[in-house]
Amino acid sequence: MNHDVMNIFNPAAEGPSFDRIRIALASPEKIHSWSFGEVKKPETINYRTFKPERDGLFCARIFGPVKDYECLCGKYKRIKYKGIVCEKCGVEVTLARVRRERMGHIELAAPVAHIWFLKSLPSRIAMILDMALKDVERVLYFENYVVIEPGLTPLQPFQLLSEEEYMEAQDEYGEDAFTAGIGAEAVREILINMDLEAECAKVREDMKETGSELKLKKYAKRLKLMENFLTSGNRPEWMIMTVIPVIPPELRPLVPLDGGRFATSDLNDLYRRVINRNNRLKRLIELRAPDIIIRNEKRMLQESVDALFDNGRRGRVITGANKRPLKSLSDMLKGKQGRFRQNLLGKRVDYSGRSVIVVGPDLKLHECGLPKKMALELFKPFIYARLDAKGLSGTVKQSKKLVEKERPEVWDVLDEVIREHPVMLNRAPTLHRLGIQAFEPKLIEGKAIQLHPLVCAAFNADFDGDQMAVHVPLSLEAQLEARTLMMSTNNILSPANGKPIIVPSQDIVLGLYYLSIEKDNEPGEGMAFGSRAELEAALESDVITLHTKIKARWEGIDVDGNKITKVIETTPGRKMLVDLLPKHAKMQPEMIGELLTKKAIGALIDQVYRHCGQKATVIFCDQIMGLGFKEAAKAGISFGKDDMLIPDAKADLVGATRDMVSDYEQQYVDGLITKGEKYNKVVDAWAKCTDNVADAMMDEISKTSVGEDGRTSEVNSVYMMAHSGARGSKNQMKQLAGMRGLMAKPSGEIIETPIISNFKEGLTVLEYFNSTHGARKGLADTALKTANSGYLTRRLVDVAQDCIITEEDCGTSEGFEIQAVVDGGDVVVSLEQRILGRTLAAEVKDPASGEVICPADTYVDEDLAMAIEMAGVQSVIARSPLTCETRVGVCATCYGRDLARGTRVNIGEAVGVIAAQSIGEPGTQLTMRTFHIGGTAQVSEQSFIEAGSEGKVTFKNPSTVTNSDGDLIALSRNMQLVIVDTEGKERESYKLGYGTKLKVKEGDKTTRGQRLGEWDPYTAPVVSEVGGKVKFVDIAEGVSVKEETDEATGIASKVVIDWRGSAKANALQPTIVVQDENGEPIKLSSGSTASYMLAVGAILSVADGDTVRPGDIVARIPTEGAKTRDITGGLPRVAELFEARRPKDHAVIAEITGRVEFGRDYKNKRRIAIVPEGDEAEKVEYLVPKGKHLTCQEGDVIQKGEYLLDGHPAPHDILAILGVPALANYLIDEIQEVYRLQGVPINDKHIETIVRQMLQKIEVKDPGESTYLAAEQVDKIEFIETNERLEAEGKRMATGDPVLLGITKASLQTRSFISAASFQETTRVLTEAAVQGKEDTLEGLKENVIVGRLIPAGTGAIMRQYQVIADDLDADMLAEREAAVEAEGLPTEIAEAAAEEMAAEEGAS
């Protein structure tokens, strides 16, 4: 007793420490052990006294006292009676807090089924009984009897009997001949009598005997479930409940409102229902009521328990008085408002405030302006403590008064308290980690927070009314972390791409750009200045201008740190910037030798950061910001309407395009082109015209004239703003002074008539109407985009949250090949950029000399990356998170550089979350649009290739035919044109499409810009490889082709139609055969005949009986036919790739290398076989819908991994056929393409990290001697561990293939059930976990946040390591002491005392 009193004022003891959490089914005994008493009455509180009713839902005897240390009747009050149970009212005298943790229970008069295990699919109860869910429900809800024990009767076990059948059976066989039951009792009896081990053995036997795939799957699922029950220690009958727990009353409170009414939690209503029905059932059973009444009551009890656990899962939703569905226990956990996401993963915190932000250009980068009023409120406890320490107040109450009166000494104290105490600023939405940064507060008057202009980019903040929140880190550790990790000065680089994110924008850029302009013939040209002061004097007295070319003295340091001076040619403006550069050997004045656009400034800051370090960069950024603002203000740049110059060439360009368009119209009328082709060509012509007008306008605006005095005129202000990157873009200027161009309909199609006017001229009514159409869609899209982007980020974070750097080096030699990204001869991303900051997996050799540039396992920094690029290396093998062999997490060597720091990554860095944020954050900038034919108004179809460099032409896999004009026509689908230089090195290679007309021959010399080949971008031709007579096969008018007469032109053309609809036409296959003069089909070199199958939509270019020459086109397939598949762009495309969905018309990929053969058709599918060259492999067959355009002909040799059918490939196919590296490359290229289009740079590493998380499962192929089942999906780590165990025991190991899961699926299948439950489908995840008796080892971030521990990343990772080390040391010391005791034979009392001493030490620590 005395001991307790001593401890009363001490803080509560720390909670139990644990390192795993297990979830399982609760047995009735377990529920009783939790409970403090049975709830027998549905009453809550007495309406007059407001005291809880005895034995009711709020009973104080069961759940504990309402007031601290006071029993209900008031006999015992005060702490001295602690622990006594009042003999009058039965309440234990203790803290009222126990009402939050004590549970009760309800004894059910009849068992009921737990709805989660009954209705959560797949139904566990139905599966273990091997019955249909419908049948189980029939039994449970008292519609049918079930035979439990058939005895000697011909009835089957588990057979259902209706009421009549049951009566008849009883009459026929006698009442005791068999047992049948109804309701949950019957099901429970079956489950109790079930012998799981025997049942498992039986299912195993069945699996061996069955031949059907379906049955195998069914057996496997059932076997898995029964094994789960056996291994987890759960009993199947626990899925039927005989007693239900009642949660503590404080968690379902009853709150009095004014006016004598009460607000109550829905759970109380649901519990009341259960108790009422249960009591009524008890009474009916005692009264021996008729069976039918009891049965009805039992069914109602089952329904009320169902509603309590999961309202609305079965039957009608139970609603409250206001027709609103009641929130059941499941709803408490589910969704955004549920326990997981509302209270465990995100909490509201104390010591925080929010206010509007304003710009603070006079702040240093690490400061923010904090309003005094806010600071006073936020730092209250610190102020109280300091006032006390200084002796200005004696008690907390006095301090409070001082602060409330805002006495002068309080402000002095506040200044002291705030000094060097960082605060965190956050702007919602926090899309990446730079959305929260720490600053040192600077007290300001006013009520708005001041923010440094350079951090706006990271916060994505602007000052049009944005608000930000302030948080105060309280503990010393928190302050330390805020200062070292989160300070704005420590976050100069963006974690997404490693480029500086503290980059000037807008006014600053404009000021710096203006400073760096250089002009001819300015006053004072050629003067030389010795010092900064001379220069300023000359500027002040207008002897020179900012743009005059002058000579000046520059002082710097060389490599050894010695001072050097030299004379440089520069302008006064540029000299100011040069003077700001940090003193360093690499910082040369030539760095500021051209116009400073936003990009150039970014690159400059990057250089400063790389060479001079963080501190110098921060100072440099602050200085150029000040300079930029000052000079922009002094320059006084502004613009008026007249600065927008409309180019004179516009009229001619528009006129020329109008002529072209009328040409196309005429061709269409004459029947030379189809409607679709005309549309494509018109859109194309206008798109080109718009671009030409825009270029003419830019030329016009960027021109500067020379005046009579030889001075260059001022640069056009609008051009300056756009060119410097301060504001506006070429696209916006095009709309202001060029022509607005083509507009899109909301569906994404492009309207043929463009908007020829610009905003300066004004739009006509029709043009305005056309433009509103797409503009409105744009606004609607933006709203949807934000939500979609947020959801993508959430899924990404969830799948990657447990990916943490856990060790230095996993020691793998694996890696995957990295090359430069080349698009149409242009290098989009160089090899240098792609390998920077990675670790090489293999040595890199100089392709020319063959000497080793660097060995394997070298970390690639800027210098090495450049050296590799300069040596002309084509590709390197680098390590990647994808190939890392660390069990849990990733190793630092495979990951490489931490992009936000520019150094090797630290252990404990949460790279998964960083990857998710880097990919999700730019999501709002991506478009939502799904482009229809024609793409955007920007994209013109490419219809030719030009040589990008000089060299010699060679062909790979050539297959050509020379047409009547003497041009080569490409006939192979995998033919490549390669240009090699004099040393025989590949300079560029182009894949040639089927039917490309080549302008060069093998061995020709090329010059840069020469046309190499061309094709019609709007149709795919079918080319005859031989000359002869055309014979039509299966081309029947009205069945497989129809003559389409164009209404506009009256010209008829024959088009292949979908013939598969009619029954008799099913076997048709429209084909064009080329015959010789004897009427025999001509044989090709490959051995097949010259016959060409036609796809739906093909337009015939020849008639039956025509003569054709080699290279002639016999039919053409309009490519919108092949391209109507929408080009899913932007966000939906990224989501589609990460979710690993199969695209609608996905490509068919060849699984082996071999020759293509067409087999017998099957229904309306065409059978295609690939026959391998050797004998060892089997041939592979595919069924492809007829009428689809195939990319290969019969007899073609096709390589493994090539497409038989065009389209987007399904990622699963790539993984299965070509393996992980090919899949990774495909996903990286596709995802990066979307981001590159929007100009968002993201490092490949992030995408690789997410893909790694998508490949965490393995599908078992051969289980070996493991307990796995064939085709079962197993966790990769688990699989490796099982195999290691099998190998150690000398057993046969399991084999399997990696499986690709979409991010949602992967999140739901993580090893941690807590993480999965907090993501989506909470009930399903928890049901599954409970049946399996899963353990959560708390490895990821989410589960640790939920249970309230330090996350195992960053400082938390280190703390965890120390903990493990400390535990081991303790164990060793104890062992040593015991050994010593045994050796010396000390008396046991001393040993016990020593042990107690140890325990006390442990407790104290």
UniProtKB/Swiss-Prot annotation:
Its EC number is 2.7.7.6. This is DNA-directed RNA polymerase subunit beta'. Mg(2+) binds at D462, D464, D466. Pfam families: RNA_pol_Rpb1_1 (PF04997), RNA_pol_Rpb1_2 (PF00623), RNA_pol_Rpb1_3 (PF04983), RNA_pol_Rpb1_4 (PF05000), RNA_pol_Rpb1_5 (PF04998). Zn(2+) 1 binds at C71, C73, C86, C89. One of its GO terms (biological process) is DNA-templated transcription. DNA-dependent RNA polymerase catalyzes the transcription of DNA into RNA using the four ribonucleoside triphosphates as substrates. GO terms for cellular component: DNA-directed RNA polymerase complex. Binds 1 Mg(2+) ion per subunit. Binds 2 Zn(2+) ions per subunit. Belongs to the RNA polymerase beta' chain family. Coiled coil: none annotated. Keywords: DNA-directed RNA polymerase, Magnesium, Metal-binding, Nucleotidyltransferase, Transcription, Transferase, Zinc. Its cofactor is Mg(2+); Zn(2+). It comes from Maricaulis maris (strain MCS10). InterPro entries: DNA-dir_RpoC_beta_prime, DNA-dir_RpoC_beta_prime_bact, RNA_pol_asu, RNA_pol_N, RNA_pol_Rpb1_1, RNA_pol_Rpb1_3, RNA_pol_Rpb1_3_sf, RNA_pol_Rpb1_4. The RNAP catalytic core consists of 2 alpha, 1 beta, 1 beta' and 1 omega subunit. When a sigma factor is associated with the core the holoenzyme is formed, which can initiate transcription. Zn(2+) 2 binds at C810, C884, C891, C894. It catalyses: RNA(n) + a ribonucleoside 5'-triphosphate = RNA(n+1) + diphosphate. GO terms for molecular function: DNA binding; DNA-directed RNA polymerase activity; magnesium ion binding; zinc ion binding.
